[in-house]
A protein has these predicted regions:
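Multi-pass membrane glycosyltransferase architecture that uses lipid-linked
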Residues: 1-226, 258-392
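Luminal/periplasmic active-site loops of membrane-embedded glycosylation enzymes
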Residues: 49-51, 226-255, 259-266
Length: 392
């Protein structure tokens, strides 16, 4: 498949997203359940505060970098759907990046394009972005870091990585894997080489720059709402997390050390272990994929947009996964069914008033088990030394 044919696919996928953006406006006016993500309304309100000369953090529950609100100022002065269009456009850029990363790994154009289509035509990606969720921005910059590392541009990779951490905290978890991927096979872990110094220095400077700018304009409230809050948050609302019911039952109590350790240590141990297990440049994308699955699966809060974190990395690793089609179908079906069971239990609670908290928790346990099974099978099917196809 040539670049022109691929461009046609990108235009078609963007057009499909724009149709959904147009539909979202109709849906919100005619149905009780809103299509538009509640966070999108928060973004728009925060942008309106900026246009009025105030702080975006004057809007309750705005807990993001101020730059998202700045980007969405046209929501207020031009078109309310502007942000959804921007997020949809970044969806297309993500697909292009996936293709370029695979082409850079010497996979042929057919394989690279097919894998990128798994994101380009992914209905979940389409819906989440057109609902107005901003995670497509974070995902794009995470993949851009992987692209620059593959191109041996360590300074630029660090600069982008610093911004991606400022934009969303979760890319921070990939830092150790990136650092280890740049070490020499015969070098000591504790002695950094020039590549590692370039990556770390540029990342720290970039992160400090963006954070300092935000602090200069919005002070401590920026630090608390966009950074500190995410470290201490305790969300007792029902969500996919396996920890939901525990947090719900202890909502009125201050979290103890045991509770924090129970929810944080398993994730930390696995993230560090995966960083060392796949500590080579060749395996970096797969290390990031497995870490993203762990972060989402073990997170005290899990919502649908978090699936972006690993679904965007899966196509990059797909050519090195030796798994039968039947196994792929079984795992995908199990993942969707487990998620659907949880959604049904949540529906009974939200719209029928049925006390289904225990069923939501049990469904969350099932979803957790399915996610772990998917992770294990993906790891077992990965072949880092699998010969890539010759470029056509």
């Amino acid at each position: 498949m040539g670049d022109k044919r691929y461009a046609i696919h990108c235009c078609a996928a963007l057009a499909a997203r724009l149709v959904l953006v147009a539909y979202s406006n109709f849906h919100d006016k005619n149905f009780n359940v809103s299509y538009t993500d509640v966070d999108y309304k928060v973004f728009t309100d925060a942008a309106r505060h900026i246009t009025e000369g105030n702080s975006p953090y004057d809007r309750d529950t705005y807990r993001y970098t101020p730059f998202i609100a700045m980007i969405l100022i046209p929501n207020v002065i031009i078109c309310q759907e502007f942000g959804k269009i921007v997020f949809s456009f970044f969806d297309i850029l993500i697909s292009i990046l996936i293709r370029q990363i695979l082409l850079g790994q010497k996979f042929n154009d057919k394989t690279s394009s097919f894998c990128s289509f798994l994101w380009l035509y992914n209905p979940l990606a389409m819906v989440i972005s057109t609902r107005g969720n901003a995670d497509s921005l974070a995902v794009f910059f995470v993949l851009l870091v992987a692209y620059y590392l593959q191109k041996d541009n360590y300074w630029l990779a660090g600069i982008v990585h610093g911004f991606s951490i400022h934009l969303r905290l979760y890319p921070l978890a990939f830092s150790l894997a990136m650092y280890l991927a740049l070490r020499k096979s015969s070098g000591l872990i504790i002695v950094p080489n020039k590549k590692q110094v370039a990556l770390v220095l540029s990342c720290v400077l970039s992160l400090l720059t963006w954070t300092s700018l935000s602090y200069y304009f919005y002070g401590y409230k920026f630090l608390y709402e966009s950074l500190l809050y995410h470290l201490i948050r305790k969300d007792a609302r029902h969500n996919f997390s396996v920890y939901f019911y525990m947090l719900y039952l202890s909502a009125n109590n201050a979290p103890g050390i045991w509770q924090r350790a129970f929810t944080f240590l398993p994730q930390l141990i696995l993230l560090i272990g995966l960083s060392f297990s796949y500590s080579s440049k060749r395996n970096l994308s797969f290390s990031m994929l497995t870490q993203a699955i762990v972060m989402v699966t073990y997170n005290p809060v899990m919502t649908s947009q978090y699936f972006f974190w690993f679904l965007s990395l899966l196509p990059v690793c797909l050519p090195r996964l030796k798994m039968s089609i039947s196994r792929c179908v079984v795992l995908t079906s199990a993942w969707i069914i487990a998620q659907s069971i949880w959604l049904f239990a949540a529906y009974l609670l939200e719209f029928k008033g049925f006390n289904s908290f225990i069923y939501i928790w049990l469904a969350g346990l099932l979803f957790f088990i399915v996610n772990i099974k998917v992770l294990i099978d993906v790891m077992n099917s990965y072949h880092s030394t699998m010969d890539v196809e010759k470029s056509q």
